[in-house]
């Protein structure tokens, strides 16, 4: 069973960051060690919340505690997501180095959350710059959405070919694998939700139906997507197998959420279909 140190946000009510990804990852058979960068009452797209950003030293101290009991060598991957500050990011890279010193086979999966002010997702100053300058070259796998891909590659991405090229430019700087979590306007069809999974040698495209939630889209979809992909890859799935399972599993969560007329992702209700999706979507090699 794989062990994943997941360093990202936590909400007490609802699902975002670790609160979205932790349970689905466990449902696929991974041990998740959740380490929270922030603890908020709820996710920020409600427009108001309470809570705090964890001091960067808190992250390092917790991981040192795990090292002190001799367990860090059993960590197979570090996953990072929403950061409360750029300084937290610097400490996370120190943690990645510490984990890799204990287990040289461990991977670093970076979900470079950079914020979408128009959607109510706010990140602290310097976080985007941290991802571009430091997290990108340190990562083994990175999972930007379209906007984040453009920021990381420093140019516009207007179609699928552009996205593959931009992903390969990122690979040249460090990562082995790039997941483009949402192609949006750069995809083949505005009627579908599309993703890319790219390495230096391969590029896989997949699409599924959009699920219409109106103006109030659920939060945490990207967090679940990143977490599930990491689990599948650690378990030995091929790029194609991992992409197909994750796409179907996330779709099952979206369908359950829509059916129950909820705003928060219904990961518990969809748990059996996360492990064994009823839908299937085929990935195409480009």
Swiss-Prot record:
Subunit and partners: Homodimer.
The family assignment reads: Belongs to the pyridoxine kinase family. PdxY subfamily.
Q: Which UniProt keywords apply?
A: ATP-binding, Kinase, Magnesium, Nucleotide-binding, Transferase
Record protein name field = Pyridoxal kinase PdxY
Specify which residues bind substrate according to the UniProt entry for this protein: 9, 44-45, 223
Q: Which Pfam families does its entry note?
A: Phos_pyr_kin
Q: What is its EC number?
A: 2.7.1.35
**A cellular component term, taken from the record's GO annotations:** cytosol
Cofactor(s), by name: Mg(2+)
Quote the function comment for this protein: Pyridoxal kinase involved in the salvage pathway of pyridoxal 5'-phosphate (PLP). Catalyzes the phosphorylation of pyridoxal to PLP.
Annotated pathway: Cofactor metabolism; pyridoxal 5'-phosphate salvage; pyridoxal 5'-phosphate from pyridoxal: step 1/1
Cite a single GO MF annotation: ATP binding
**Organism in which the protein naturally occurs:** Salmonella paratyphi A (strain ATCC 9150 / SARB42)
Q: Where does ATP bind?
A: 111, 143, 148, 181, 208-211
- Give the GO terms filed under biological process for this record: pyridoxal 5'-phosphate salvage
Q: Which reaction does it catalyse?
A: pyridoxal + ATP = pyridoxal 5'-phosphate + ADP + H(+)
Q: Which SUPFAM superfamilies match?
A: Ribokinase-like
